[in-house]
Regions:
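Core SAM-dependent methyltransferase catalytic element
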Residues: 155-188
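Short aromatic-enriched loop/helix-cap "lid" or pocket-rim segments at secondary-structure transitions
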Residues: 15-19, 102, 155-157
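Conserved beta-strand signature within the Rossmann-like core of class I S-adenosyl-L-methionine
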Residues: 5-7, 110, 136-148
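Class I S-adenosyl-L-methionine-dependent methyltransferase module
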Residues: 1-96
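A short acidic, Gly/Pro-enriched loop at the edge of an enzyme's catalytic core
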Residues: 92-111
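Short, charged/polar "capping" segments at the starts of alpha-helices
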Residues: 12-14, 150-153
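A short glycine-rich, Lys/Arg-flanked "PGG" loop and its adjoining helix->strand segment in the class I
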Residues: 125-138
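A short SAM/SAH-binding and catalytic strip from SAM-dependent methyltransferases
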Residues: 108-123
Length: 188
């Protein structure tokens, strides 16, 4: 699996580039996953938290919890260097740009766009959706936690929706919508 990240934040891109360079030298990347035990988390969320990263890494020693956050639980996962080395960070604004696809890449099978589209108005969301659609292969999927208006003729349609609840707090959850690129006549 290749992972291409698209971000306009130079700090995010620099961080990912440094992690990739370190991975090429054989160094793993450690992810710290905090969880507040005072919150009544959904059992499925806790099971997910306990197993996150198991397919690409191994448990690691978590960071020390600062005294001000006493009680916070942290799970750490050391991601294998060969996984991190497959990340390709790209500086790209999905509203006004799209990734140029070469002959070796017909488009992505999956694009995950969470906590992104919410920052744009309806017009910008439409532009972003058009660019994301062009980057998908025919039949490819886009997952978002922000429903966007579908524009007839854009070549993408909503194919599913799910609400995911993390805890008993009212704002702890997401509404995941998935869209599928419709193959155009010349792509069939």
């Amino acid at each position: 699996v290749d992972v291409v990240t698209l971000d306009i934040n130079p700090q995010v891109n620099a961080h990912l580039t440094q992690a990739k360079q370190a991975a090429r030298r054989g160094r793993p990347y450690t992810i710290q996953l905090p969880r507040d035990p005072q919150v009544r988390w959904n059992p499925d969320f806790i099971a997910y938290w306990r197993s996150f990263g198991d397919q690409v890494g191994v448990p690691a020693t978590p960071a020390r919890v600062p005294p001000a956050l006493a009680g916070l639980q942290i799970r750490a996962v050391r991601v294998q260097p060969e996984v991190v080395a497959r990340i390709e960070p790209v500086d790209l604004n999905i509203v006004v740009q799209r990734l140029a696809l070469d002959a070796n890449r017909e488009g992505f099978d999956l694009i995950v766009a969470t906590n992104i589209l919410v920052y744009y108005d309806a017009f910008e969301q439409g532009l972003a959706l058009a660019n994301l659609t062009r980057m998908l292969r025919p039949g490819g999927l886009l997952l978002s936690n922000n429903a966007v208006p579908e524009v007839p003729g854009m070549g993408i349609r909503s194919v599913g929706y799910r609400t995911t609840v993390y805890s008993d707090r009212p704002d702890d959850g997401d509404h995941i919508v998935w869209y599928q690129k419709i193959a155009s006549r010349n792509e069939r």
